[in-house]
Amino acid sequence: MLKPLGDRVVIEVLEAEEKTASGIVLPDSAKEKPQSGKIVAVGSGRVLENGTKEPLEVAEGDTVIFAKYSGTEVTYEGTDYLILRESDILAITK
């Protein structure tokens, strides 16, 4: 499994909708870039200026909404993930 460093998290991105509300099937080029996903791994935390480490506010298993064009897309063992900094996460959904 991927283990992110510092204040980074690994997210399994939730797929974009395949159809519109009226039932029209969308081609890949017309789909919105997904902005939500499930956190599968978190780093150890961010290092503050005084040298102490602050743990992340998010945890494995959280479903989050993140900035549209943030992070780095990676494929690991056949699964697509997004690695991004905690500051790119906008909200945790409950």
Swiss-Prot record:
Coiled coil: none
SUPFAM superfamilies: GroES-like
One MF annotation (Gene Ontology) recorded for this entry: unfolded protein binding
Main location (coarse class): cytoplasm
Record's keyword terms, sorted: Chaperone, Cytoplasm
One protein family per Pfam: Cpn10
Keyword Cytoplasm carried by entry: yes
A Gene Ontology biological process term: chaperone cofactor-dependent protein refolding
Subcellular location as annotated: Cytoplasm
Gene Ontology cellular component annotations, sorted alphabetically: cytoplasm
Listed InterPro entries: Chaperonin_GroES, Chaperonin_GroES_sf, Chaprnonin_Cpn10_CS, GroES-like_sf
Segments passing through the bilayer: none
Keyword GTP-binding: no
Family: Belongs to the GroES chaperonin family.
Free-text function comment from the UniProt entry: Together with the chaperonin GroEL, plays an essential role in assisting protein folding. The GroEL-GroES system forms a nano-cage that allows encapsulation of the non-native substrate proteins and provides a physical environment optimized to promote and accelerate protein folding. GroES binds to the apical surface of the GroEL ring, thereby capping the opening of the GroEL channel.
Subunit structure of this chain's protein: Heptamer of 7 subunits arranged in a ring. Interacts with the chaperonin GroEL.
Entry protein name: Co-chaperonin GroES
Native species: Listeria welshimeri serovar 6b (strain ATCC 35897 / DSM 20650 / CCUG 15529 / CIP 8149 / NCTC 11857 / SLCC 5334 / V8)
UniProt lineage: Bacteria, Bacillati, Bacillota, Bacilli, Bacillales
